[in-house]
Structures are given as C-alpha cells and as structure tokens.
Amino acid sequence: MVEELKSGIIVFIGPNVGIYTANHPADVKRREKGYEWALPVKIGDKVWIGGGVTILPGVTIGDNSVIGAGSVVTKDIPANVVAAGNPCRIIKEAEEGDRYGIIDEKNGQQSIK
C-alpha cells in the first residue's frame, strides 16, 4: 500500500533517510490477516533533513525547518524550528542562519553548513 509524498521546493535530504507512508497494526491477529494502511507525508519548502532520519506515516514537516541527523519523526513538526531526537522534538526556533544557510564571506556563496 502506498500513499502520497508531497515535497516542497529546495528540500535538502541527507543520506540514508527513510520516508514511510505504509503501516500495519500492532495486533498480531489483524496483522496476520494482512491489514495495512497508508498515510501521506508532507515536507514543506526549504526544509533540511539530516542523514539517517526516519519519517513515519502521516507526518507533516513545516516550511524552513531543520531535522537533526538520526532523528525519528513520529509527529508533525511546525514551520521555522530546529528539531531532533528519538522521538523528534523541537529544540529551538530556527534563526536566520538555521533557515537560510550561511553566507561564505570569501566567495559570497550561500550554503547550509
């Protein structure tokens, strides 16, 4: 069973990220019968997802947010925050540098560090 994955513009996704839309019941009898369901995952604009993150079914990640490496995202993450952990939780409001990257003063290029 597959459900939709909606991704915004300029989304950075690190290596070994798992984005899952399908799930199954914890109850053995229902699982034996093959019951399964799917929920969409929505990733906003200008989101940065660190390496090794797991995103579970039904989660929405808001615009301009940063998800720390190795996090397990089990619930919605609002816009403009830095979140990390297992389970993923808000660490702080995203600051200008967190949301838009760092300007390299030597060459004037913008990059996320």
Feature names for model-found ranges:
Residues K75:
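Active-site nucleotide-sugar/metal-binding loop of Leloir-type enzymes
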Residues M1-V59, A94-E95, R99-I102:
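Flexible, glycine/small-residue-enriched loop-and-beta-strand segment within the central core
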Residues G62-S65, P78-N80:
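Conserved catalytic segment of ABC-fold P-loop ATPases
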Residues I103-I112:
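S-adenosyl-L-methionine-dependent methyltransferase catalytic module, highlighting the catalytic core
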Residues A79-V81, N86-D104:
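Conserved beta-strand-loop-alpha-helix hinge in the C-terminal portion
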Residues G52, G70, N86-P87:
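Gly/Ser/Thr-rich beta-alpha loop segments that engage phosphate groups in nucleotides
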